[in-house]
Amino acid sequence: MARHLAVTGEEDPCSLYLRDILFGKLPGYKCHRHKLNHLGQAKGILRGGNMAVFHGLRGTPYDIPPEGTILFIEDVGERPYAIERMMYNLKLGGVLEKLSGLIIGQFTEYKEDYSLKKDLYSTLDALVKEYDFPICYDFPVGHVTENLPLINGAEVEFVSGKKGVELLINPPI
């Protein structure tokens, strides 16, 4: 987010959202519907971030507890097979089945690996299609120009609907 501020300036919409958060005004985000989204709604604690960093914390005291979590993931510069492997780690480790929701953000600075026979989002979708919780793809978070600020540990309401995605950040109790 710091790089984002330096590159886009303080009047950029994402910078304004960050300023609002810092001054106690919590945003609600709405974005487009992706064709792979899984419809549904959930409440939970927003946790996540960079997939490689998150993966490196697995099995440590800093690992994210999956129960009641709406997990968001993004990454930069990782190869698709590495992202697939990290997602398999979450699946086989029992993390995915305990989530309340999954927000798949932007994966940038990589080249599609056509040996996987499908694009990255389709590869990830094959690993999560069995779950009942809401899932959205292409959420504007990550190392991108439209990088919405998210609050790790915030209670959120997440809706993946036919007309789009909504993420509401609730005030702390």
Where are these regions (language model features)?
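Solvent-exposed alpha-helices and their adjacent loops that cap or buttress functional pockets
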Residues: H38-L39, L46, D63-P65, V95-L96, ...
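ATP/nucleoside-binding phosphotransfer catalytic cores, i.e., glycine-rich phosphate-binding loops
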Residues: E109-I173
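Conserved beta-alpha junction segments in alpha/beta enzyme cores
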Residues: I45-V76
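Conserved active-site and cofactor/substrate-binding residues in soluble primary-metabolism enzymes
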Residues: G9-P13, I45, G49-A52, E78-R85, ...
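Conserved anion/nucleotide-ligand pocket segment
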Residues: M1-L57
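Internal helical hairpin/lid segments
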Residues: P65-D119
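Short, structured loop/turn "capping" segments at alpha-beta junctions
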Residues: K25-R33, D63-G68, E97
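Buried hydrophobic positions in well-ordered alpha/beta secondary-structure cores of metabolic enzymes
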Residues: F54, L102, G153-V156
